[in-house]
Amino acid sequence: MKKKLLNILFWSVISAAFIGPGTITTASLAGASHGVSLLWALLFSTLACMVLQEGAARITIASGLTIGEAVTLTFGNQPWMKWLLAGAVIFGCAAYEAGNIVGAISGAGLLFPLPPWVFTLAITGIATVLLWGGSAGSIAKSLGALVAVMGAAFLYTSFFIDESPLAITKGLFVPQIPADDILLVIGLVGTTIVPYNLFLGSGLGKCQQLGEMRLGLIIAIGLGGIVSMAVLLSGTLSPLPFSFEGMATVLEKAVGLPGKYLFAIGLFAAGFTSTITAPLASAITAQSIWGKGEKNWEATGTNYRLVWGSILIVGLVFGLLGLRPVPVILLAQAINGVLLPVAATGLLLVLNNNRLMVHHTNGAFSNLAGLFIVGVTLFLGIHQVARAIFMAIGYQSSFDSLYFASISLLALLPLFWLGIRIFRR
């Protein structure tokens, strides 16, 4: 029993990694704007996260390689695929970093009446020192405990909502896509299925058995999904227009004055830990694909530091620009939601590499689940891109049958190619 509990705590790193300012913002905004009707997006993304993270960890357990090394072996004669996968993850990290620093600034701003640029310089300065010295991990874990306490406060607050059990059940199992807010749906998916977590999960899979990995991972991610849903439910109590101040007031009403400060500290902690994690993940991703055995790609190497430093600079710039936090954070999650099909496609192709996975290649069910995940995220992403193009040329798109069929066809074409690649292996 003790071993199983420790295993769950071990894999809780993944759920802690996706409960950052992005989850707090997108889930709260979804609840405030659409009630419980978008719960299905969190249920889908939680289940999809389990499928993809299990696959990522299975690669390491079966082959003894990291995802980056497995990608290099699988696409050795297709360098463009390696660049595409690494580029998607690293670009996604840069987008996340913008939201992370803005989220940390917002949390600090709820506590201290100082100009945002002061917090920006302090946060990026401390993060640089920690990343340079290699002591970021222990600090991130300590602050992660504060995020967990804030999550517990959201769970408690969710019991005070006015929605009926029937409405909540419908929101969970009957998908609804608001035509004017597709970006929010993509954001909910992108904030839960974090592409760089696939690399993190792959590394955590070392020295574990498949059975214990699956149990720990499913329970840990499931708990993370429940907390995300609790944030959305709590968001239904927040007034519009949505703001962090309004959300702090919601928690204050539910748990008393400490709730306000708990939200502020938790938002800062979530943003700060993610400010460290995103640059680190981008450097690890680049290292695993391009830098095996090279001194410049070691943790103290020039290339390694250039990658995480570049991501940190992106966050610094966005923090100094003084942009409104909620749109920046939402856009960061949506960008990763659009990039997700690229990472998921690469993962599926590696999982179907017979020479690499031997007896642990994907079965029919795992492949169908993976194709479904890629299909849904492709559909959402293409719909958002199409809508943006239509708005740019002055055409108001609607969710009519012709439009729906066209977007579905565009999503099915790459899905059909992927299916042929997988099932002809």
Model-identified regions with their sequence ranges:
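C-terminal membrane-solvent junction of multi-pass transporters and transport-like membrane proteins
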Residues: 145, 298-306, 335-337, 342-407
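Helix-loop-helix module between adjacent transmembrane segments
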Residues: 49-57, 80-100, 105-135, 190-191, ...
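Hydrophobic alpha-helical segments and their helix-loop junctions in multi-pass secondary transporters
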Residues: 147-173, 182-203, 346-355, 380-388, ...
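Loop-to-transmembrane helix boundary motifs in multi-pass membrane proteins
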Residues: 79-80, 117-121, 219, 223, ...
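Transmembrane alpha-helical segments of multi-pass small-molecule transport proteins
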Residues: 84-86, 110-132, 149-154, 298-315, ...
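Juxtamembrane transmembrane-helix boundary signature
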Residues: 14, 41-75, 85-92, 417-424
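Selective recognition of specific alpha-helical transmembrane segments in multi-pass small-molecule
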Residues: 44-52, 56, 212-237
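Flexible loop linkers connecting adjacent transmembrane helices
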Residues: 27-29, 54-79, 106, 137, ...
